[in-house]
C-alpha cells in the first residue's frame, strides 16, 4: 500500500518517523484545586497539541510513573516499570515506521528513568529523547496551567482551601518534611510557596502552555533535520 505521506498539514514527510509519548503520573495528590492525574493530563495536552501542529505521531501515554522514595504524595512504580512500558511503546512504534521517539515528561520523579534511555536506543536501534516540563508541585504555575486547560477547580473558596498546607501538605511540598530534608531544590521551592502562597494567574498559565508546546515543536523540527 502506497501511503500519501505528503497529505495534511504537516512539517514535511520526515515527520512521520517521529513519535511523541506523554509521561506523567496518574495517582498523585495535588491539593484541592487539581485532580490526582494532573501531570499526565498536562503531558498529554502538550504532546498531542505538538503532534497536531507538526504531523508527528502521538503514540499515547505511559501508565506507570516513578518517584524518589522520600517524596510521599501519591502511588508510584519502580523506574523499571516505566522502562518496561516504554519498551512496549517503542517496539510497537517501530512497526509503524517510527525511528525517533520524543518523551514529553511532566512529572519530576520520572527523571529517574533518563538513565535507561540509552539502553532503549541500543536495544531497538532508534533515537530516544526526553523533554522535562515540570513545576513546583500543585503551586501557582501548575494551578494556572490546569485552569487554562480546564482541569482546575479554582474558584475563590477552593483556592483558599488549597492554601491550607496542614490539610494539603503536598501543595508546594510544604508539609512533606522528608522530601524537604533530602532535596535542597524541593525545600527552596517549598519556602517560596510558604511565603507567597498559591495563586491563580490565567495569563501565566497561557504563557507556560504556549512556551511548552513551542519547546516540543522546536525539538521535533530539530529531530527531522
Swiss-Prot record:
Fe cation 2 binds at residues 30, 39. Its cofactor is Fe(2+); Zn(2+). InterPro entries: Creatininase-like_sf, Creatininase/forma_Hydrolase, FAPy_deformylase. It catalyses: 2-amino-5-formylamino-6-(5-phospho-D-ribosylamino)pyrimidin-4(3H)-one + H2O = 2,5-diamino-6-(1-D-ribosylamino)pyrimidin-4(3H)-one 5'-phosphate + formate + H(+). Requires one Fe(2+) ion for activity. Gene3D superfamilies: Creatininase. GO terms for molecular function: 2-amino-5-formylamino-6-(5-phosphoribosylamino)pyrimidin-4(3H)-one formate-lyase activity; ferrous iron binding. GO terms for biological process: F420-0 metabolic process; riboflavin biosynthetic process. Its EC number is 3.5.1.102. It comes from the Archaea. Pfam families: Creatininase. Fe cation 1 binds at residues 28, 39, 107. Keywords: Hydrolase, Iron, Metal-binding, Zinc. Pathway: Cofactor biosynthesis; coenzyme F420 biosynthesis; Cofactor biosynthesis; riboflavin biosynthesis. Catalyzes the hydrolysis of the formamide of 2-amino-5-formylamino-6-ribosylamino-4(3H)-pyrimidinone 5'-monophosphate (FAPy) to form 2,5-diamino-6-ribosylamino-4(3H)-pyrimidinone 5'-phosphate (APy). Belongs to the creatininase superfamily. FAPy deformylase family. PANTHER family: 2-AMINO-5-FORMYLAMINO-6-RIBOSYLAMINOPYRIMIDIN-4(3H)-ONE 5'-MONOPHOSPHATE DEFORMYLASE, 3-DEHYDRO-SCYLLO-INOSOSE HYDROLASE. Homodimer. This is 2-amino-5-formylamino-6-ribosylaminopyrimidin-4(3H)-one 5'-monophosphate deformylase. The gene is arfB.
Amino acid at each position: 500500500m502506497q501511503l500519501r505521506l505528503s497529505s495534511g498539514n504537516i512539517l514535511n514527510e520526515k515527520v512521520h518517523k517521529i513519535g511523541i509519548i506523554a509521561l506523567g503520573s496518574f495517582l498523585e495528590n495535588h491539593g484541592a484545586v487539581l485532580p490526582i492525574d494532573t501531570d499526565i493530563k498536562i503531558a498529554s495536552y502538550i504532546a498531542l497539541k505538538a503532534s497536531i501542529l507538526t504531523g508527528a505521531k502521538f503514540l499515547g501515554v505511559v501508565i506507570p510513573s516513578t518517584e524518589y522514595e522520600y517524596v510521599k504524595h501519591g502511588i508510584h512504580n519502580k523506574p523499571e516499570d516505566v522502562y518496561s512500558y516504554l519498551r512496549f511503546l517503542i517496539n510497537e512504534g517501530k512497526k509503524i515506521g517510527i525511528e525517533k521517539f520524543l518523551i514529553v515528561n511532566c512529572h519530576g520523579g520520572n527523571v529517574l528513568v533518563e538513565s535507561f534511555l540509552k539502553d532503549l536506543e541500543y536495544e531497538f536501534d532508534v533515537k530516544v529523547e526526553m523533554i522535562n516540563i515540570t513545576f513546583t508541585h500543585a503551586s501557582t504555575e501548575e494551578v494556572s496551567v490546569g485552569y487554562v486547560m480546564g482541569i482546575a477547580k479554582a474558584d475563590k473558596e477552593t483556592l483558599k482551601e488549597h492554601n491550607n498546607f496542614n490539610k494539603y501538605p503536598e501543595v508546594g511540598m510544604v508539609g512533606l518534611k522528608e522530601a524537604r530534608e533530602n532535596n535542597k531544590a524541593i525545600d527552596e521551592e517549598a519556602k517560596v510557596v510558604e511565603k507567597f502562597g498559591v495563586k491563580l494567574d490565567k495569563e501565566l498559565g497561557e504563557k507556560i502552555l504556549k512556551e511548552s508546546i513551542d519547546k516540543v515543536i522546536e525539538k521535533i523540527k530539530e529531530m527531522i533535520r
